[in-house]
Design a protein with these regions (language model features):
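N-terminal helix-turn-helix DNA-binding module of bacterial transcription factors
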Residues: 1-58, 335, 340, 344-353
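N-terminal helix-turn-helix/winged-helix DNA-binding helices
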Residues: 2-4, 42-78, 87, 97-98, ...
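Flexible loop/hinge segments that line or gate small-molecule binding clefts
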Residues: 98, 121-170, 249, 275-287
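Flexible loop/turn connectors
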Residues: 213, 235-353
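Short, solvent-exposed amphipathic alpha-helices that sit
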Residues: 37, 71-86, 167-170, 193-212, ...
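Central regulatory/effector-binding core of bacterial HTH transcription factors
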Residues: 82-128
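An alpha-beta-alpha
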Residues: 169-210, 218, 317-331
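Hydrophobic alpha-helical segments within soluble ligand-binding/sensing domains
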Residues: 156-185, 225-234, 251, 292-310
Length: 353
């Protein structure tokens, strides 16, 4: 056979070569979980499955995501598409780009295509001011729906989100341990549920770790590099010495803005991102970030949708996934001076003249 050998597949799946052979030849005597491990190993190694082992497509699922220029959304889309294919479903990925189709428009198109279900990521359900009538209509007609990254208590469907409160607690514990007492939060518009939860979590964590001796300043812009830069200029002007950003892209913008003011990251200002998308370990310096568990969230979303398609309501309600703080090179001990870091840097330079 071309490509991976039986030994390669067996090693990847953690089974014997004989077991791999039985699966490839569709022989009995292999449990369903073991068979799936072998099939997954085939896919991972790029081996072309024999025709009789290819998943049979039983339907179409719609996946509505924000713009894919944010790597974390692209990673979610890829993971969900792969998981759905293993369940026998093709995926119609609908991207909401500025000036393009709206979420409601996509949902109408998907319904006309008679999709088996819809997964919406960071959609209207994350916006506390948005009209939820389209979601209620989907529930009323019985079309399976899963909402990811955002929460609306009025929608009786499975909802899965990053645990923003846990994220802020981890970030605060790390920064307070480094001596930081005035923290800035750079996030998007306050009408979004994840933004509100991050701010609430940050303030609660500061009270818990510093017993009222800390200070929090929030800047609401947009979830982009430029938004992060604008927020950082605002926060640095108010004397923060550490910035927690609502996304990795915002963190990159914050670092750029700090450097434009002659500040060093992390010597003058510490910066933490959110999501820990793939390239953040290669930035200069490597970005400290709160890693979103893309695989787990995507798996939960697909499992919830499959359960809904089967009529199982056990997955209904909200479930939170705890992120992981990955400490790299953009956080360091706070400077002893309590001055505004930009003013402190200018004062130090003046003393050297």
């Amino acid at each position: 056979m071309s490509g991976p050998t039986l030994a390669d597949i067996a090693y990847q799946a953690g089974v014997s070569q004989a077991t791999v052979s039985r699966v490839l030849n569709d022989k009995p005597g292999v449990s369903s979980p073991t068979r799936q491990c072998v099939l997954t190993a085939l896919d991972v190694l790029g081996y072309q499955r024999p025709t009789h082992l290819k998943p049979v497509t039983t339907g179409l699922v719609g996946l509505i995501v924000p713009e894919l220029t944010n790597p974390v959304f692209a990673n979610h889309a890829q993971a969900i598409e792969t998981l759905l294919s293993r369940e026998g479903y093709a995926t119609a990925v609908c991207t909401q780009a500025p000036g393009g189709m709206r979420e409601d428009d996509y949902i109408r198109v998907l319904r006309s295509r008679q999709v088996a279900g819809i997964i919406v990521m960071s959609g209207s359900h994350a916006d506390t001011t948005a009209d939820m009538s389209t979601y209620h209509e989907l529930v009323d007609v019985g079309l399976p729906l899963v909402l990811v990254n955002g929460y609306s208590p009025s929608i009786a469907v499975p909802q899965i989100s990053d645990d923003d409160v846990s994220a802020m607690d981890q970030a605060v514990a790390h920064l307070v341990g480094l001596g930081h007492k005035h923290l800035g939060l750079a996030v998007g518009p306050r009408r979004y549920v994840p933004v509100q939860r991050k701010e609430q979590g940050l303030r609660a964590a500061m009270d818990r770790h510093l017993e009222g001796r800390g200070r929090v300043t929030v800047s609401n812009t947009v979830f982009s590099v430029d938004g992060g830069a604008r927020a950082a200029v605002d926060l640095l002007g108010q004397g923060v010495n550490a910035i927690i950003c609502g996304s990795d892209l915002m963190a990159l913008g914050a670092i750029r803005a700090a450097r434009a003011q002659g500040l060093s990251v992390p010597d003058d200002v510490s910066v933490i991102g959110c999501d820990d998308s793939d390239l953040m370990r290669y930035t200069d310096p490597p970005l400290t970030s709160l890693r979103q568990d893309v695989e787990l969230i995507s798996t939960m979303a697909v499992q919830s949708l499959m359960g809904s398609i089967r009529g199982d309501t056990a997955f209904f309600g909200e479930r939170l996934v705890r992120p992981e703080l990955v400490i790299r090179g953009t956080t360091a001990s706070a400077r002893v001076s309590t001055m505004n870091p930009s003013v402190s840097r200018q004062h130090s330079a003046a003393l050297c003249l």
